[in-house]
């Protein structure tokens, strides 16, 4: 049996709160010359009762848009900044590849992954806080099996789509929501970005604006979130990406 002394640094006083609960298995792994300790924690939760639903649309230009039952809307993340950073990482990666600096490439990949995870943590925390502030009982997301086919993309952001993990963001949302007793459900994503929430006719948005012949107009991602809010819930909470 090996005893290991560890220094726990907790900038936001979150981990110390977790240590108050029942601790489980300790797992130690090595990544990029650093040792990482992971401890499972059992946290009791009380699922919220009620019928208030939050629809959340995930994307690239706008990382997330959420809308409540009473039509309160919140945008999360900065798609332009994310796109700029992805291009920056890609440019540096190309130069390192041409110079055959493999160790530097691995370090850059790790740095990019940490940055993306940090963005997803911030977005997921914002969504769950917004849900809590509005007494939401259920958060609804698109079923991730088909999100890559339904995400609004163009050739110039196709590379970003294939390197950004909607699956990870959904997991972060589900994890944080569970801690505060909010249920997460997944819905059929078919036509959520095309169906008019007012008259149910299907239309294609022009750039970022959705406009229907019935007179309804909204930001296209708000339309997606509105339709996700009341779309058909699918079984199994599929999260394959």
What spans do the regions from the language model cover?
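Basic, amphipathic alpha-helical segments enriched in Lys/Arg and hydrophobic/aromatic residues
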Residues: 167
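Metal-dependent phosphodiester-processing active-site neighborhood
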Residues: 1-159, 170, 174-241
């Amino acid at each position: 049996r090996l005893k290991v002394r560890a220094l726990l640094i907790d900038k936001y006083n979150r981990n110390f709160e977790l240590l108050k609960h029942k601790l489980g298995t300790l797992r130690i792994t090595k990544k990029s010359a650093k040792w990482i300790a992971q401890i499972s924690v059992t946290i009791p939760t009380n699922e919220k009762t009620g019928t208030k639903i939050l629809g959340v649309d995930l994307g690239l230009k706008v990382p997330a848009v959420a809308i409540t039952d009473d039509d309160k809307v919140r945008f999360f993340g900065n798609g332009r900044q994310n796109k700029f950073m992805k291009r920056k990482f890609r440019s540096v990666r190309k130069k390192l590849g041409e110079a055959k600096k493999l160790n530097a490439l691995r370090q850059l990949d790790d740095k990019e992954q940490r940055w993306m995870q940090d963005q997803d943590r911030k977005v997921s925390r914002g969504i769950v806080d917004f849900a809590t502030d509005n007494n939401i009982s259920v958060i609804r997301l698109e079923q991730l099996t088909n999100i890559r086919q339904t995400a609004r993309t163009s050739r110039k952001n196709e590379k970003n789509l294939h390197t950004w993990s909607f699956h990870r963001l959904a997991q972060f949302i589900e994890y944080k929501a569970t801690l505060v007793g909010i249920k997460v459900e997944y819905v059929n994503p078919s036509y959520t970005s095309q169906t008019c929430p007012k008259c149910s006719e299907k239309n294609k948005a022009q750039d970022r604006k959705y406009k229907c012949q019935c007179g309804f107009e909204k930001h296209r991602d708000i339309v997606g979130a509105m339709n996700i809010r009341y779309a058909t819930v699918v079984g199994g909470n599929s999260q394959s990406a």
